[in-house]
Regions:
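Beta-strand-turn-beta hairpins that frame and shape the catalytic cleft
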Residues: 1-5, 119-133, 254-259
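N-terminal active-site segment of His-dependent metallophosphoesterases
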Residues: 1-83, 88-96, 165
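Active-site neighborhood of phospho(di)ester-bond hydrolases with catalytic His/Asp-centered motifs
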Residues: 6-8, 53-58, 81-86, 113-118, ...
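Active-site environment of divalent metal-dependent phosphoester hydrolases
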Residues: 11-17, 60-66, 87-97, 119-123, ...
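Charged helix-capping and loop-helix junction motifs
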Residues: 67-71, 96-100, 220-230
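Binuclear metal-dependent phosphoesterase catalytic core
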Residues: 123-125, 216-240, 248-285
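Active-site-proximal loop/helix segment associated with metal-binding centers of metalloenzymes
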Residues: 132-202, 208-213, 217
Length: 285
């Protein structure tokens, strides 16, 4: 059995610095050589031991997401897998930040594996694990009107005001192209790994959701910016599990024979007690 702790949508850019581990616990960690608890984010004490930690996007803006992922890896004693959400790219040039995220993760010496249409493979006591990761974005097709959904998203989603390309703002058309590339890559890579390594476990990690069922409060005209209806096309060659974020809707479910989970914290400033009491999810495969 392989144990994966997972969380998403921590939105640390919206959270002030705080002493995450108060009093004598923080003092002892500093003086006993124990890795310090991250100063921002959810409490990570008293969690079950995990083989891998998954951070499914909207962790922090820019390279700070990698910094936090490394702190989590050190504190929990497990490698961290990170995919970018849309918020990682806010106030950034996406074409420049993407390679910078890969480079920053590589400098952690294996503590953080950043994924974008790439695979992180682990040989663990419970077996071999392949984690396939990408932001995923969306096909804007959820409500049956791709053009209308793209126009609505361009007016109402901060992604298309706050994310930049080298010379222009990021547009829904750019998100759609990235989605199509990631979607094709997932199919090809799952098929290849099933053939080459049939005994291994395969877990997909995306930021955007793979089905309407996981929209939570984000239904209606904005829904196509949050999810695409993908699971039926993976029915014949499914991953063992799919972890996502983006919709701020916590769930554990099975659809089309695929276990789908999400553990978003959300905005501490907006979502109050639920965010403050947040605990990562635990997935066993």
């Amino acid at each position: 059995m392989i144990r994966i702790l997972y969380m998403s949508d921590l939105h640390l850019e919206m959270e002030r610095w705080r002493l995450a581990v108060p009093g004598w616990k923080g003092f002892l960690s500093r003086h006993n050589g124990v890795p310090r608890h991250p100063a921002r984010g959810p409490m990570l004490t008293d969690l079950p031991q995990a083989d891998v930690v998954v951070l499914a996007g909207d962790i922090h803006v820019g390279l700070r997401a990698v910094v936090y992922a490394e702190q989590v890896s050190e504190f929990l004693g497990a490698p961290a897998v990170l995919v970018a959400g849309n918020h990682e790219f806010y106030h950034q040039q996406i074409q420049l930040l993407q390679p910078a995220l890969f480079s920053a993760a590589e400098r952690t010496g294996g503590k953080v594996r950043y994924l974008e249409n790439t695979v992180a493979s682990f040989d663990l006591p419970g077996g071999r694990l392949h984690v396939l990761g990408c932001t995923l974005w969306t096909d804007f097709a959820l409500n049956g009107d791709v053009v209308g959904a793209m126009e609505f998203a361009s007016r109402h989603m901060n992604d298309y005001r706050l994310i930049y390309r080298v010379t222009t703002r990021f547009q829904p058309e750019n998100a759609l192209m990235r989605h199509e590339r990631s979607r094709a890559w997932l199919h090809i890579t799952i098929a290849r790994l099933r053939e080459e390594d049939p005994e291994a476990k395969i877990v997909v990690v995306t930021h955007h959701a793979p089905a309407r069922a996981y929209l939570g409060r984000r239904d209606g005209n904005i829904a196509p910016a949050y999810a695409s209806e993908l699971l039926p096309e993976f029915r014949d060659n499914p991953p063992d599990a799919w972890i996502h974020g983006h919709t701020h809707f916590r769930h554990e479910s099975v659809q089309e024979g695929i276990r789908v989970v999400s553990a978003p914290r959300g905005y501490v400033s907006h979502e109050g007690g639920r965010a403050l009491e947040f605990c990562p999810g635990l997935l066993e495969v």
